[in-house]
Amino acid sequence: SGLKKIDDKTVEVSFTELGQGVYTGGNGLIASALPEHHLKDIPIKDLEKSERVRSKVLTLGAYTIVSNVQGESLELKANPYYFKGKPKIEKATVEVVNSNTVVSALKTGKYDIAIRIPTDLYKSYKDLNNLEILGRQELYYSYMAFKVGKFDKVKGENITDPNAKMADLKLRQALAYGLDVEQMVKAFYYGLRERATMAVPPAFKKYYSKDIPGFPYNPEKAKQLLDEAGYKDVNGDGYREDKDGKPFEVRIASMAGGDIAEPLVQFYIQQWKEIGIKAVLSTGRLIEFNSFYDKVQADDPEIDVFFAAWSVGTNLNPIEGGGRKSPFNFPRFASDENDKLMAEISSPKTLEDPNYKAEAYKKWQEYYINQALEVPLTYRYEIFP
């Protein structure tokens, strides 16, 4: 079966084949076991509502469930059979709290810790003297991406269009250099973000490279690149025309939600105005979350550039978000060089040498970041008051 009992708390698992993600996150291996004797008689369709899943739970974890009020609260008690020993805290209560009231609850000391509290509330509680605020970098990055092609559903692959509006490399690089991300972070995020340079946060020390600078703010370089690419202001109105001297504008797609969504996109528009590029909102407004991704994935012709974010998994295989055949390669970029560099990241050599994948990943990032297709903007910190 591939399973071997070593002792009462240890099982050895043998595999006939392993993937390249084994060194970073287990390659999707299940990290917990389910008790067959406890669940085998429950039909799959009834599992979610079963009390053996919702309240009378057998678990390997430090706590067991006492009661569960769906969408409201969870009562926990220490598990005396936990493999590290019974926890010293006997019980815990987890409550779902409206973001409008969580800060006032923190002020009164009602809760010992708040998890997943919106970062835009940070300013309202950061100076409270009854809190100690901890934080860590999330496995996340926000980015700006340019549409350079379409996804061919028949062929099942991304087709890059050399005549797409955003196909010019120097144009994309100029727009990347034209955004002052450092200023944006200070103005909108209270220090809870920092400028990103790669599609992997520094938390992955082995894969992150300080030698890849990304696109630090450089408006003069941006203007130079636009001049070289043939985008020049021919009528003196402050905005550059395209290579043929015709009016040129970049259509932005950005998501609605939160107090800073609108000011943030206006910041982008103003920044690009300063290098002579006219930018407007696609659809004339911010786009609701689900509609936004529907439009992006459908390659809506009204979108030239969009602002979004990725959660970063531990597998660190970029083929899902940047591969030739991936529907989630939203810029729709494909090239032989990209294929070659990505293939090395999942090469069998990664299993022979734990360092091989990290070096292959950095080589791919050097190439891909320079293409300015999906430009990393910020890394984010999650906080625990």
Language model: regions and residue ranges:
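Bilobed periplasmic-binding protein-like "clamshell/Venus-flytrap" ligand-binding domains
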Residues: 20-26, 186, 229-255, 303, ...
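Gly/Pro-rich hinge or "lid" segments in bacterial periplasmic/extracellular proteins
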Residues: 28-87, 91, 101, 219-224
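Acidic-aromatic pocket-rim loops
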Residues: 136-156, 290-349
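A bilobed periplasmic-binding-protein/Venus flytrap-type ligand-binding module shared by bacterial periplasmic
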Residues: 77-80, 141-170, 187, 212, ...
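Ligand-site clamp/hinge motif
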Residues: 51, 79-124, 278-280, 285-287
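Extracytoplasmic/peripheral linker and loop segments enriched in polar/acidic and small residues
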Residues: 2-4, 8, 164, 169-173, ...
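Append "and occasionally in soluble cytosolic enzymes with long acidic Gly/Pro-rich linkers
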Residues: 77-80, 165-270, 274, 337, ...
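Surface-exposed binding/hinge segments that line
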Residues: 1-42
